[in-house]
Amino acid sequence: MLLAKRSLISSDGIQMTKNRNLFYLFVIVGIFVTRVLFDVVNQIEVHFDEAQYWVWSQNLSLSYLSKGPLVPALIAISNKVLGQTYLGLKFFSYVAYLGTVITISLAAFKLTNRKESFYIALSLTALSPAIFILGGIASTDIFLFFFWSLTILCYVCFIQERDEKWFYFIGITTGLGILAKLTMVLLPLSI
């Protein structure tokens, strides 16, 4: 008697087995670990911008000079959980790097409905020098990339589904992006 593997149907109608989901999880964890190991192996020191955000995280406020409160708030949270460590400083930057890679890959998949597009976008985004380097620096830029790409993904979903709920998500992601870097305000104006 043949037993079929239990499969899951995603919202896009793509059939995924548990093994494939495990593979995706392995790839995502691999990208995250590679990014962290790059800093460890190359002994990347704390950047002066990161030191500035770390000081701000010790004295939280609604804004800092020309910067929003998101980065210092995230550093404060990670320092509470992970302590005053290198990983405590950079944890959310690594998460934003990973989120940017996944979000751009999902947008590519949604636009083409081809798995190859997802993997190509995943590879190119993960290895993009700007995103890769900024993914290891606790500054506003990687969060700008993350929320920018998340807003684009929400816009693609709106175009395809014509559901007004995506406008709320566009507003939320744009607002969070503005809390990271004011340049984010240009995205809705350009769409």
Predicted regions and their residues:
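Membrane-interface transmembrane helices that cradle and orient dolichyl/undecaprenyl
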Residues: 109-115, 151-166
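Transmembrane signal-anchor helices characteristic of membrane glycosylation enzymes that use polyprenol
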Residues: 20-46
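Short helix- or helix-capping micro-motifs
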Residues: 28-31, 118-126, 174, 178
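Loop-to-helix entry region of an early transmembrane alpha helix in multi-pass inner-membrane enzymes
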Residues: 69-73, 83-102, 134, 138
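Extracytoplasmic catalytic/substrate-binding loops of multi-pass membrane glycan-assembly enzymes
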Residues: 39-53, 63-77, 83-87
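Short acidic/glycine- and proline-prone juxtamembrane loop motifs at membrane-interface regions
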Residues: 130, 136-144
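Membrane-interface alpha helices of multi-pass inner-membrane proteins
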Residues: 59, 121, 166-182
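Transmembrane-helix signature of polytopic, membrane-embedded enzymes
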Residues: 24, 104-127, 145-146
